[in-house]
Amino acid sequence: GQNSTYYGKAEDLVLSQEYITPVGDIRTVDVPAYATGPNIDQMMIGSEGAFGILVAVTLKVFRHQPENTTRFSFIFPDWPRACAAAREITQGEFGLPSVFRLSDPEETDVAFKLYGVEGTPIDSIVSLRGFKKGERCLMLGTVDGDRAYTSMVKRRLKRVCRAHGGMYSTGLITKKWEHGRFTDPYMREDLQDYGVLIDTLECATNWDDLPKVHEHVRAFIKSRPKTVCMTHMSHCYPQGANLYFIFIAKMDAEEFHEFHQGILDAVQSSGATMSHHHGIGKMTAPWLEGQIGKNELEVFRALKRHFDPKNVLNPGGTLALDLPDDDRRLP
């Protein structure tokens, strides 16, 4: 989830699993590592109920030390310098933040309103420093772990961010973000009552290609008049990061479906992955073969034939396993 930059994604936390499948039970062992052929855990993770029903899982656990958690936020003059700072942080090998989120200019302007920054002394200082609306970018996050570790990582974060033109804006913005982190999404239901639709699509790419992906996908979304497009990264690695594209616009269901497909086409043509962690499901299935390749998709289908020869588990297009050829959207 939101702490994956330090702890890893959900699949990185799995030690063992147990599934019930039409051909029998599948169990793996809860040891930290093994080398006994291809990893069955990884074969099953992400299968979205198409290979079996997950009935038990053993996960890694970590020490809970909230008293040591330290918060930070920085404002950058623009997106390129903010991305350069994020890249240097993840590649610095001095430790990683737990929550690590970087918003592009449009999302930053919305965040200043949502988190109560607009009109505060922080906002005034940012403006005096020449950080302009429509250009400035907000980075926020937390560091978890031993007290000495969290203090050291925060010091290094400050050093890197300042070297890229970032201004430290305290941990107060992060606290504001935490306060609304799990309630803000519920605005979607209220807005739908007025015909305003919100959706989130996410992808992943490497650092060199990230600016191109951001520009390409955002350009398509903004080509529709009166459409808000907020973008952020929140799962970062030494090699690259994910990008979340959140769009808000007034449209009906038919127009939404067509627009949504266009965004996925833009993600595919940008060279990014079709998903970083949301999964493929049925909605994104038409793009899967174009993402991973025909031979690679046949591996999934071979596993499906083994575990579920009668196709009773989650049929109807999940993972493109029984998707009609005419429904494929290839690059």
Question: What is each model feature region?
Answer:
Residues 15-34, 80, 215, 249-258, ...:
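A short, flexible low-complexity segment enriched in Lys/Arg and Gly/Pro that occurs
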Residues 1-3, 122-123, 323:
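Conserved, structured C-terminal
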Residues 281-331:
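Activity-critical C-terminal alpha-helical subdomain
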Residues 70-72, 198, 283-289:
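Short beta-alpha connecting loops at secondary-structure transitions
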Residues 46, 60, 88-91, 163, ...:
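Short, well-ordered loop/turn and helix-capping segments at boundaries between secondary-structure elements
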Residues 1-101, 329-331:
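FAD-binding subdomain of flavoenzyme oxidoreductases
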Residues 75, 83-262, 266, 270:
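C-terminal substrate-recognition/cap domain of FAD-linked oxidoreductases
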